[in-house]
Amino acid sequence: MSLPAPDRRMGGWTGVGYDDIEMGRTYPAQPLPISAEDVARFYRSLGEARPPPAIGTRIPAFLLNEIRALKKQMKFPPGVLHAREEIEMRSAARLGEPLTVSITIANKYIRNDRRFIVFDQHVRCATDQRSIMTIKHILYWPC
């Protein structure tokens, strides 16, 4: 089976190519800081005027689902697209709890002449290692 040609329409880059991505690679857990201002900004973006959140307030799950942790570990090529995700919420995260996020490259595959990378993200409470959320991201990887 021949591999599709890399899609380099977005111009030159010096990032991580599809062939360089190692399935099964796990990156060290990183802090996932969420501040009261982050929570307040989230609600303002929805048009809600709320009082400043207090320590112990539940963090909206949307704020925990991010790919900055992976972008800190590898440089994305131009043209990466978020194709799909699956989220499993296991426990509430509370403002003031130290959170961590770990990343594992779960799979990579070619479908319809397009390259895809699957990575699993796991958010935990650093204090008691409680599982907060797992997210399976599927990204289109152009080259």
Question: Which residues does each PLM region occupy?
Answer:
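Low-complexity, compositionally biased segments
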Residues: 22-23, 88, 140
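Hot-dog-fold acyl-thioester-processing enzymes
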Residues: 1-84
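HotDog/MaoC-like acyl-thioester-processing domains
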Residues: 1-16, 93-143
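Residues in flexible loops and secondary-structure boundaries
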Residues: 29, 35, 40-42, 89-90, ...
